[in-house]
């Protein structure tokens, strides 16, 4: 099986996701509103050799410094770099609290974000004490409009409140702005990562032309048709 979705995924993938979900619950306890899966695992095009695992978690209140430290330690443990290839996969996750979701804001603020691009920074800052400044400012991410739109379209609730009860509708203009931001990034990395970049651009074109909210793979099929 070269690609699959959540219902058909390998035990090792399901176990990795479940371990992170349980780690979020153990760390955040009553503050955790829900954990949501999106991306290739919900579109049915997860490639165990290439794909990452996309998660989004929502909390009732903003995260404390200690919660952020524990989350960084959790993800440094259970996410893995893209290289060398591994049966466990890289994890990308954003955490937002309810006031960052409602009322809707664009670009969307968030409390915490992890991806393998940040592994070195988190490792260094946990060691040198810089983590104690993680609450000094709030960051925003234009990609969250796209992530939340996809969650509303075909996301999976792994824990907590249902998707419809948590996430507001995303204005189409904000979703388009998020897609265009992704397109600019894809063009920037075209030479270094042509496959990813072309697939990303196909997904953008599918929505801009036909209003299709889809995975990168489905965007490529749309382009071929």
What is each PLM-predicted segment?
Residues 1-36, 66-68:
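Helical scaffold of the NTase/Pol beta-like nucleotidyltransferase catalytic core
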Residues 39, 43-77, 90-97:
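Catalytic metal-binding acidic patch
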Residues 172-225:
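Extended, basic/helix-rich recognition subdomains
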Residues 5-12, 59, 63, 189-193, ...:
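Conserved aromatic-histidine-acidic binding/catalytic patches
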Residues 42, 100-101, 203-206:
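Short, solvent-exposed loop/turn segments at secondary-structure junctions
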Residues 29-31, 49, 84-89:
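Short helix-terminating capping/connector loops at secondary-structure junctions
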Residues 2-8, 73-189:
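Conserved NTP/Mg2+-binding pocket subregion across the NTase superfamily
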């Amino acid at each position: 099986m070269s690609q699959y979705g959540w219902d058909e995924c390998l035990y090792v993938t399901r176990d990795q996701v479940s371990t992170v979900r349980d780690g979020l619950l153990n760390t955040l306890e009553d503050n955790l509103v829900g954990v949501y899966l999106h991306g290739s695992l919900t579109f049915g095009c997860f490639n165990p050799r290439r794909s990452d695992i996309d998660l989004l978690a929502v909390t009732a209140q903003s995260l404390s410094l200690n919660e952020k430290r524990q989350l960084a330690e959790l993800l440094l443990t259970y996410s893995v770099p893209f290289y060398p290839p591994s049966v466990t996969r890289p994890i990308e996750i954003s955490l937002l609290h309810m006031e960052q979701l409602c009322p809707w804001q664009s670009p969307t603020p968030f409390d915490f974000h992890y991806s393998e691009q940040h592994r070195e920074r988190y490792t260094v800052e946990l060691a040198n004490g810089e983590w104690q400044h993680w609450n000094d400012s709030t960051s925003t991410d234009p990609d969250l409009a796209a992530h939340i739109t996809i969650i509303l379209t075909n996301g999976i609730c792994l824990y907590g409140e249902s998707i419809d009860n948590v996430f507001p509708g995303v204005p189409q203009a904000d979703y388009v702005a998020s897609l265009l931001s992704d397109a600019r990034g894809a063009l920037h990395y075209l030479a270094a990562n042509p496959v990813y970049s072309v697939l990303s651009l196909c997904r953008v074109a599918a929505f801009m032309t036909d209003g299709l909210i889809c995975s990168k793979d489905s965007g490529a099929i749309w382009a071929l048709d």
